[in-house]
């Protein structure tokens, strides 16, 4: 069985992120590979900026005083299709001020034709409603996420920048192979 996981890493190119991906992986290193990746620049009209964590230490206190603020969320929905034995999943990124708002935004966009959109307890995440995972993305190993509203901003869809099978466990093949299109 293959275990899939979404990881958030920072680098000037994908090759720069390999040490972090290997270090953060919780399973066996043998067979560790990348299936796809995507650089995220904009979500829901907000530009995504990375700020060194040391420079962003004032944010939590500012957040407490000003009430809810826009945050970047990763949401994974699950549901069923009448013509399939497997559970259907769709995940993506949204900007919202609360977990409930993030869930509502995701459900309005994804798996509209699925039945019984629901929550799986596979990850042990204390989710809200019918969402598998609804996690705020506040920081990534030494970096904080800063959102800047940009009117008429181009959206970043989740079409991969690259996809295929790229082993990063130290065994061949290396380097990253060309994608099959």
Task: Name these PLM-found stretches.
Residues 1-35, 84-122:
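Extended intrinsically disordered, low-complexity coil regions enriched in Ser, Thr, Gly, Ala
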Residues 1, 19, 23, 29-85, ...:
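Intrinsic disorder/low-complexity detector
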């Amino acid at each position: 069985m293959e275990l899939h996981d979404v990881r958030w890493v920072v680098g000037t190119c994908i090759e720069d992120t390999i040490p972090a991906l290997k270090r953060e992986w919780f399973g066996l290193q043998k067979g560790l590979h990348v299936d796809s990746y995507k650089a995220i620049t904009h979500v829901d009209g907000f530009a995504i900026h990375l700020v060194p964590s040391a420079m962003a230490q004032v944010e939590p206190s500012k957040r407490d005083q000003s009430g809810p603020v826009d945050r970047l969320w990763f949401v994974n929905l699950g549901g069923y299709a009448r013509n399939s034995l497997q559970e259907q999943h769709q995940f993506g990124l949204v900007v919202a001020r609360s977990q409930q708002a993030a869930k509502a935004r995701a459900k309005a966009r994804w798996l509209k034709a699925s039945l019984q959109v629901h929550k799986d307890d596979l990850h042990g995440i204390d989710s809200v409603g019918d969402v598998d995972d609804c996690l705020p993305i506040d920081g990534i190993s030494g970096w904080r996420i800063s959102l800047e509203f940009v009117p008429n901003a181009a959206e970043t869809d989740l079409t991969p920048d690259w996809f295929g099978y790229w082993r990063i466990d130290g065994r061949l093949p290396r380097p990253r192979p060309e994608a099959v299109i």
